[in-house]
Amino acid sequence: MTYTDLTEMLEHHLETQNSIWVASISLKGVPMRMVYPTGNPFPIWQPSARDGMPDTILGRPVVWTEKVPLAGSAGDIGLYDFNHYWIGDRQALTFASTNAEYFKYDQTSYRMVHRVDGRPWMNTPFTLQDGTSTVSPFVILGAKTT
């Protein structure tokens, strides 16, 4: 991940106030060492100055997680606006319990079921009025080729 990678992701991202970076925790040290180009000594990453507030990269909040691919893989960092994500609740949360199977051990089994799915409401990037620039509310960094 380089400064150029991040600025190109911003270039192709549908700019909104709700955009956040979601990055692999294995990348956490990389932006901390990056600075703006041309001798500007300020880091592109800023730690939160307040408890409960996220760190930022290039002014956008960043969430560090192990739920995305490891550093060097496609999707290890992405810029997302989750307001462009639909959630489909297929079944309300249901609870059930039984002691039939483990009755002799004086135990009860519990089951909770919630059927839910989600997906972006835009399947492809869209072209801006200039006829060439494409943007999307979901932009990921591709895999490294080195």
Please give the residue ranges for each predicted region.
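Structured, hydrophobic secondary-structure cores that serve as assembly/anchoring elements
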Residues: 1-146
